[in-house]
């Protein structure tokens, strides 16, 4: 593979994460305006965004098999067509059914693109370099999560219709579409070059189960925590502005942490540092949940920084459980994480209703403790060390 081709594929991976981050995180900014547009209360409007999450989940799950049937370049180009149709649907429709359909299509497109982006990184880079590259790729999710809400605020403050926010997000996919030209993608399944040697099917092993549970619990814990921090902070007498600043600080620190760990991870065994980070994150979340408002700002900054590398390292270790990176395995771990996203309000909503926001934060803390236990147990069964040794010879 030529260096320029590798750079193009790497940028497609970066932008695939930026696309998903923009779509998921911008929701809170535009929900009120969309509710006004359809003359609906915000509470019933929020349910339609489940179609976005459902699209992401279904496409990540199915793409484990689709990748071996439909070439990656074809998928990305077809995704561009779907993106144009979805944004056009948002712009020219006043029907809630069509809005929900467009949201589902956007979810499908971003899920397919993100799973391709993840697979490209696991295919092109080996060992510890794979971990640091995946981490840097994941930082584009957070970066888009910071940039696009600012773009949305700028447009909405000038009374520009909400659907132009999605048109701006569509520009990310225009860049991906342009990068597919003159770019060679890895061939999979029936499109892969034929070899005389029989294809050896590798068993995944119990380590994949530990990593999948860790991925689900981590995302469910993280989103369950950050979704209820503002309500919890307001209950302690903080202003809405200060409560919002806590969330912003978390994501800012999370992004800085990703950049720092994309360098730091190269010097450590991934399973060991993952266990340390998961334990630290569980302790820091407990400090936040039981501390005074005066210490909240510092503890959430520390939590954002030290938890930033956990999810990506889980995916990296998953990809290293087999000798050759398996798209089905990587997508399975990703799917478990996405299920965590889907369950966020299903799990935390009733807890808050019965016991208040702090109970939801303590539940999230318990989930982080489960992540620590899974990472610790992984140390006894993980195959990443033997596969790293093989690839380094």
From Swiss-Prot:
SUPFAM superfamilies: MFS general substrate transporter. Coiled coil: none annotated. The chain crosses the membrane at residues 11-31, 51-71, 78-98, 101-121, 134-154, 162-182, 206-226, 245-265, 273-293, 297-317, 332-352, 361-381. Keywords: Cell inner membrane, Cell membrane, Membrane, Transmembrane, Transmembrane helix. The keyword Cell membrane applies. HAMAP family: MFS_TsgA. Belongs to the major facilitator superfamily. TsgA family. This is Protein TsgA. The gene is tsgA.
